[in-house]
Amino acid sequence: MVKQLKFSEDARQAMLRGVDQLANAVKVTIGPKGRNVVLDKEFTAPLITNDGVTIAKEIELEDPYENMGAKLVQEVANKTNEIAGDGTTTATVLAQAMIQEGLKNVTSGANPVGLRQGIDKAVKVAVEALHENSQKVENKNEIAQVGAISAADEEIGRYISEAMEKVGNDGVITIEESNGLNTELEVVEGMQFDRGYQSPYMVTDSDKMVAELERPYILVTDKKISSFQDILPLLEQVVQSNRPILIVADEVEGDALTNIVLNRMRGTFTAVAVKAPGFGDRRKAMLEDLAILTGAQVITDDLGLDLKDASIDMLGTASKVEVTKDNTTVVDGDGDENSIDARVSQLKSQIEETESDFDREKLQERLAKLAGGVAVIKVGAASETELKERKLRIEDALNSTRAAVEEGIVAGGGTALVNVYQKVSEIEAEGDIETGVNIVLKALTAPVRQIAENAGLEGSVIVERLKNAEPGVGFNAATNEWVNMLEAGIVDPTKVTRSALQHAASVAAMFLTTEAVVASIPEKNNDQPNMGGMPGMM
């Protein structure tokens, strides 16, 4: 394919136009008075959302250079979402501010490498100051506050807080669509482990890339399955029952994996293969946990059992299994309650007896998976469009809450970033490095400025007053009042704020040091017009 090139200022300005188009679409959503964005969907109803990363992912621009700029900011949103699960709009606003200010300086003759060093230096100091100002999340109310702020809905914050209370801070919480109007919380026994499907062709929902199995059989073995013939007798019994099967094994490979995928694609049966969790002795113990939870028998040489001789009554069952690329969740296993209780008691005894912190931590994880269960937030709404929007908000709020439990909370509403302004301004630097520090200083005020503008106020006035306010005191855009943000429950997770700043700075620094851009030339439409027929011809 033929390529086209742009250099230096032409390249950067073209990419900046793309950055601005994406960021301008995303930043209207920030703050309590932020607006929604409507996304066109080809085969379904339009999606209405205020989720930054969802909007960013939808944007494709016609001009290849502008599209590259947009993709860079998309990367900021994606990375922040991966690490912290929220804060994507803040990250986008920060990235745009740094790129715009940095480009002004590069155009004026500043050295981009010096600017990058200054940006890195400033971000490092800002992150350290954020951690110093961070407070631990210690009670149910604080967890609810974080969720409520992220979702802009107190009810959602309360549901997440209750879910975390019931299954623990590290427990498994899933979000499902409800058939009714109301949102409900349900806790079901279940187990999750960090192993996903062995082939993407096993998914049942290609949009979400998830395999969902209803009332599946579950084969638990510590063996490697290489030959399809080894499991064929068992699969024939499963096919007759017309139910799906989850295969948890040391490894499913070669002929066995190929035939499972082929039969899945032909619709002969639904089977999902996942690797057994853990390693060594811990793997055996975790397989036993899964077997007890589901009522299965572990097919292992230790018990003299062979896959060829396995029958359907050796399989476990569960009401539902969900398998993603990275995780498997078994919900409501049909194991014997007395056996589960005995296993829980055994694990508790082992936790008390062990002297190793590492072993204790792993045993506690197993106990939580066996006894803690899975909390399910069932999202209700009056229409499908509202349901999707509400579900996205709850997902963000859950991620935000987990991040808060992990690294603590800071003052919300962009206040935390302005609170570290003083520390960053004290950095001693010269020349282009100092200019790089100043780029970050200006960007630190961008989220507050945008929140104020979305509330119909003059952002510069709010920023100047905030710089002179007591630490922790900020502007509540929902009520147009100046309050102590932490006391008012307007908080952001430290991890979210930190990640947004770090990823925005990373992409901005790369953008500023760009000197040439190579893009593909769009293919022209070569369709020829229809030729006129001769008289009497079609």
From Swiss-Prot:
InterPro entries the record matches: Chaperonin_Cpn60_CS, Cpn60/GroEL, Cpn60/GroEL/TCP-1, GroEL-like_apical_dom_sf, GROEL-like_equatorial_sf, TCP-1-like_intermed_sf
EC number: 5.6.1.7
Binding site for ATP: T29, I30, G31, P32, D86, G87, T88, T89, T90, G413, N476, A477, A478, D492
UniProt-listed Pfam families: Cpn60_TCP1 (PF00118)
Alphabetized UniProt keyword annotations: ATP-binding, Chaperone, Cytoplasm, Isomerase, Nucleotide-binding
UniProt keyword ATP-binding, yes or no: yes
Reactions mediated catalytically: ATP + H2O + a folded polypeptide = ADP + phosphate + an unfolded polypeptide
Molecular function terms, GO-annotated: ATP binding; ATP-dependent protein folding chaperone; isomerase activity; unfolded protein binding
Annotated compartments: Cytoplasm
One Gene Ontology cellular component annotation held by this UniProt entry: cytoplasm
PROSITE patterns according to UniProt: CHAPERONINS_CPN60
Signal peptide: none
GO biological process: protein refolding
Enzyme class: isomerase
Family: Belongs to the chaperonin (HSP60) family.
Subunit and interaction comment: Forms a cylinder of 14 subunits composed of two heptameric rings stacked back-to-back. Interacts with the co-chaperonin GroES.
Annotated function: Together with its co-chaperonin GroES, plays an essential role in assisting protein folding. The GroEL-GroES system forms a nano-cage that allows encapsulation of the non-native substrate proteins and provides a physical environment optimized to promote and accelerate protein folding.
PANTHER family (alphabetical): 60 KDA HEAT SHOCK PROTEIN, MITOCHONDRIAL
Name assigned to this protein: Chaperonin GroEL
Chain's gene name: groEL
